[in-house]
Amino acid sequence: MKDKKLLLDRKCHVLYSKPCKKEIRAKIALHYPEAERETIWKQVQRQYADFLSDWRTDLGGKRNFHNGVGGTYDCIAIMSYYTVCKAVTSFREIEEMEENLILPTFRRLRFVDCNKPFWRRLMYRAFVRAKGGCDKWHDYEMTVAPYETDKPIYYEFTSCPAGEFAIRHGLTDIMPALCNVDYASMELLHARLIRTNTCVNGCRCDYTICGDKDPYLKEHPEYRDEAGFRRNK
């Protein structure tokens, strides 16, 4: 089915990104014979449209930076794929799909080193700018702690549309695969993420970010919980 034929309210919703579509179709090709692939893809498309038919209409559409590649709507598209293809896909595959959407941008920023005060302050400013976008759309409700020299950066979300969507549709089992990319993205900036909760398994999604050489890390070893979330003690 051509994307333009999907029944979406395009005044408030956006289509999955082209990279996301490519990822989903590539995974379908891995699991299904050629004769079935187009049918499966149409099922994913219809599931996506069905999910959005009674979903929030206040997320800003194309104007909201959270709705780009790897963002809220791509997460919904991946959950559509998961819903249709649950019998053949896996947790790691879903995790890989989100990584393939998010990490290319961070790989281009490998020169950033969170261990250095200059880059740490620039990262902090980037998070403050992101909060401005969140305040405009009230999608990911974000709080950023004041900057303190020689201390980790801290911010948190108390609202997450992707998590809200997963809870509503009984898809929380796959949310760890979509959230864990936050760890991988920070690692590409010579940084480490320390997280104890997300909006799916708690009341907030917390981000403590420090350089990968910071002694603070020793106090908060990473582990995977039973659900598959990467977390810290």
Where are these regions (language model features)?
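Short, cationic low-complexity segments
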Residues: 184, 222-233
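Short, hydrophobic/π-rich interface segment
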Residues: 142-201
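Short, charged/polar, Gly/Pro-enriched secondary-structure boundary elements
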Residues: 162-164, 212-219
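A short, structure-level motif marking secondary-structure boundaries and short turns
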Residues: 66-67, 166-169, 224
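C-terminal edge-of-domain segments
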Residues: 196, 202-212
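N-terminal functional module detector in eukaryotic proteins
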Residues: 206-208, 219, 225
